Amino acid sequence: MKLDKVILSSDDNPDYLEFWPIVSEAWRNIGIEPILFYTGKNKIKNENVFNFNLEKCDSAFIAQNVRLLAPTLFPNDTCIISDIDNMPLSEDYFQGNIVNITDNQFVIYRPDATSEDMISIMWNAAKGSKWIDIFEVDSVESISKKLLSWYPENYSIGGDNWYHDQKILKEFITRYEAKNISSITRLNDESAGFCRLNRSNYSIFFKKFYDHNKKYSDFHMPRPYSKYHKLINKVFNLNF
């Protein structure tokens, strides 16, 4: 297996959207084409940006959940889904770990990253046709209908529905795996070499924050980019 595309998403919230330029460049630097599903109202003209908005749904809800369905629009490409405020730092981690996995598998990079009722959005990868088999959608119209059917009556940002996407992913993967034994490959953090540069450890002293002796897999960046751009750019330049 080899990753072709990464699916990212954001609405018009600058805390997230500002990451698109640098994060898209990082993904390109490890050989993966970035695709942004933009759910804001003001359309963005860019060949790698897919404008997707539903008036009946909150744009944040769409941004979170459309990532599960967006890969179905690329049936012949192997797609990984990720957060827009996460920067990949290691081609070996993302590509090297799956090079010996067959194209008919669905790969869960971090199966133990959340509680048992969820699967972490970061990261999951499969051919677009596999995503079609799992979620039973294959067009913009069917994706829209699926999202509307998922939309909670009392949705609120940061509320009980905030992890809806990860719970839905768990539900659909469990259902699919029950009928398709040996169709899911789960990686292990230790053997895969997962090593995150995490914003939770942020320090104004770069030497305390960034360990040059570590081989980082990714950078969970502090928000917003406009405030922390010097730090983020420095990490980017050290790795690319």
Enumerate the language-model features and the residues they cover.
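N-terminal anchoring/stem segment of glycosyltransferases
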Residues: 1-56, 234-240
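Hydrophobic anchor at the start of a short beta-strand
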Residues: 34, 79, 179-181
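Conserved donor-nucleotide/metal-binding helix-loop-beta segment in metal-dependent transferases, i.e.
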Residues: 88-121
